[in-house]
Amino acid sequence: KFFIAGASKRGWTAWTTAAVDNRIMGFSPVVIDVLNTVPSFQHHYKSYGAWSPAVQDYVDFDIMDWMGTKEFEKLLDIVEPYEFIKLYKQPKLVINGTIDEFFLPDSWKFYWKDLPEEKYLQYVPNGNHGLKGSYATRNIFSFYYHLINDLPIPKLEWEIADKFFEINLNPNLDYEINLWKANSSKRDF
């Protein structure tokens, strides 16, 4: 059995490998918050009113213009992790940065409800696409440790509705909860 993790394009590879290799017992895709690619990138463009400078290479090669074409749809059928979403039955820890230059901090809404349990989502405060420091890796190591030692992972259920964030916790477990929030209605944080 294997645990896999990777950041950015290697995170995409973690998603696709977990879909097809039954030896994967858990995985952690990092800073690749683009499952369900088309609505995610449409949201990206609509939110900014343009493409982020981080994706300029893709714009320069007209890749963004491929969206909506038959060829692009055929490509997504093969390489888009969201196409395989029902296969992700392993425990997974998705880690993203709140100021990722490529992906918006609310891109989870295009796939999270469809992703099978057991699933965990972490956003690193002030974390860019490189997630500088050890914050993310410590959590991956802890997640992996719990999996290989068959230890329970604290489970919480959360929901965002009407601008409120609701969390339901198991009262029999100890928790430490830290809140990080940005109050700006602008998308330039």
Please tell me what each predicted stretch does:
Residues 16-65, 122-125, 130-138:
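Hydrolase active-site cap/lid region
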Residues 135, 142-181:
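Surface beta-strand/loop "capping" patches
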Residues 2-8:
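Alpha/beta-hydrolase fold nucleophile elbow
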Residues 34, 68-84:
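Active-site nucleophile elbow and catalytic-triad environment of alpha/beta-hydrolase enzymes
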Residues 101-107, 131-132:
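Conserved alpha/beta-hydrolase "acid-adjacent" motif
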Residues 90, 104-112:
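Short alpha-helix in the alpha/beta-hydrolase fold that links the catalytic acid
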Residues 88, 94-96, 100:
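Short beta-strand/loop motif that positions the catalytic acidic residue
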